[in-house]
Curated annotation (Swiss-Prot):
The lineage of its organism: Bacteria, Bacillati, Actinomycetota, Actinomycetes, Kitasatosporales. SgcE6 provides the FADH(2) required by both the halogenase SgcC3 and the monooxygenase SgcC through free diffusion. Accepts only NADH and FAD as substrates. This is NADH-dependent FAD reductase. It is an enzyme of class 1 (oxidoreductase). The keyword Phosphoprotein does not apply. The gene is sgcE6. Belongs to the non-flavoprotein flavin reductase family.
Length: 182
């Protein structure tokens, strides 16, 4: 074996929030918009979404304790997740913008439908929708981990999901075999 020549590494202090956030951002994720309904609907862009279990069907989302969405999630029994399609960067940026209007007005810039089970807005054109009942909450430092039991799930398999990595929205690269004759 020969020695590996690698670019210089950057040692990161895990107590430095800015540096640690960059390390976390090196992990590519999908992009979702988490929503709640009720008298004051709310949406929030989130990449901290994970499938947990098939039986029972569970997912988790992590929300900062200082976020308005945190207050809404702790007050309601249900939430929804829209897994964004690769072309929905505008929606992702909108629901990450802290200066967007409150309540239902924040949904004026996107097409959406009302979730029948959760009463939460579902972003039209998404790759998938999941409506969830809050199953359990866990402390996670400056975040709360919301475990949701999936009530309904809908997917559009012809759509391609959006990626987020290195602080940027990205798309999947075409498959190397795509377009080749069999």
């Amino acid at each position: 074996m020969s020695p590996i020549i690698a670019p210089p590494a950057e040692l990161v202090d895990p107590k430095d929030r800015v540096q640690l956030r960059r390390v976390f951002g090196d992990f590519p994720t999908g992009v979702t918009v988490v929503t709640v309904g009720g008298s004051e609907p709310r949406g929030m862009t989130a990449n901290s979404f994970t499938s947990v279990s098939l039986s029972p069907p569970l997912v988790l989302i992590c929300v900062g304790k200082d976020a308005v969405m945190h207050q809404r999630l702790t007050a309601l029994p249900t939430f929804a997740v829209s897994v964004l399609e690769a072309g929905q960067e505008k929606a992702a940026r909108h629901f990450a913008d802290h200066s967007r209007p409150p309540g239902v007005d924040q949904f004026d810039t996107v097409d959406w439908v009302l979730g029948e089970e959760s009463g939460a807005p579902l972003i039209a054109g998404a790759v998938a929708h999941l409506e969830c009942a809050i199953h359990r909450l866990y402390e996670g430092g400056d975040h709360t981990i919301f475990l949701g039991e999936v009530i309904t799930a809908t997917r559009w398999p012809a759509r391609e999901g959006m990626l987020f990595s290195g602080g940027r929205f990205r798309r999947f690269a075409p498959d190397a075999d795509e377009g080749r004759a069999a």
